[in-house]
């Protein structure tokens, strides 16, 4: 059974052109593509997996720095009525700011949890995320479906501090919008 069928919100992980793979034909969003083609690629991604509540970028260090590409992506996301989560694969990404300019709800990744697929590293990244959440009232942290990560995540609820609440990205964005957590 798919996440959407269980009522679990899910997002599309859209391949975008990376600096180290410039010209990669597998990227749905590439610098230099006509805006209409970018919009069609994003629209087709939604048609292929209906029910997605948002999008984040897979790779995309090149594409997320390009204004024309990001404007086309955000125009389509606005039409779909979904959010954008900037994976922050580039410190120079403009995706988040373009999303906000286009009235697309948006958030930014703040912690990569599993740059190394090893439990000790993943836990240290969670501790970093917990500290940011306590300081800022919330944090976005992302990970991959890697063996070490998938082994670690089920144990997280048992070992996480009691003052930490895990929420979905839509819940995070709602908190950001209204400025407080709904109990």
Segments (PLM) and residue ranges:
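Hydrophobic faces of well-ordered beta-strands that scaffold small-molecule active sites
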Residues: 10-14, 53-57, 84-87, 106-109, ...
């Amino acid at each position: 059974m798919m996440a959407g069928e269980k009522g679990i919100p899910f997002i599309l992980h859209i391949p975008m052109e990376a600096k180290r793979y410039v010209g990669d034909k597998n990227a749905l969003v590439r610098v230099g593509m006509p805006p209409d083609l970018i919009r069609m690629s994003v629209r087709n991604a939604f048609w292929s997996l209906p029910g997605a509540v948002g999008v984040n970028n897979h790779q995309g260090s090149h594409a997320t720095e390009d204004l024309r590409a990001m404007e086309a992506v955000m125009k389509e996301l606005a039409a779909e009525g979904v959010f954008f989560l900037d994976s922050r694969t580039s410190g120079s990404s403009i995706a988040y700011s373009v999303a906000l300019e286009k009235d697309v709800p948006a958030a930014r990744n703040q912690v990569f949890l599993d740059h190394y697929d090893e439990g000790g590293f993943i836990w240290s990244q969670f501790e970093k995320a917990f500290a940011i959440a306590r300081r800022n009232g919330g944090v976005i942290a992302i990970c991959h479906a890697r063996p070490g990560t998938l082994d670690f995540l089920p144990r997280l609820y048992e070992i996480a501090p009691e003052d930490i609440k895990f929420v979905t990205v839509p819940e995070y964005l709602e908190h950001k919008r209204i400025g407080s957590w709904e109990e």
